[in-house]
Amino acid sequence: MPSPDAIPRQHSGRRIGTTEITQGNIDNNHIYLRSFFEEFPADAIGGSNRASAAQREIAVDWGGDTVVMTDLDGAKKFFRKRGWIREFFDRHGVRAGDMVTVEEIAPYSYRVAPQRRS
């Protein structure tokens, strides 16, 4: 598993999916990954609670001060650790109806970024 300090922060990535943010996402601090969930490694997908966490975690660069290490909730199809998501929404001014892109920047390493409004 890569250490957060070893994650390339400016490397261009392979877009694996884009999702529209809902008011429910904002109210509950999560980002649905449903439409492209199969793009994530199977061993990083766990069950519906922390007790059934995945074997491996992924690194998520969300543009904050630290890279988040988390697995994926296979039942709800979102990042299990969500403490960073409120700050992500606030920092980037994300509102319901905005789009968020997920890119794979290295094996088990991803970047989450808002798509700029036109």
Positions of PLM-derived features:
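Acidic, low-complexity intrinsically disordered regions
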Residues: 1-118
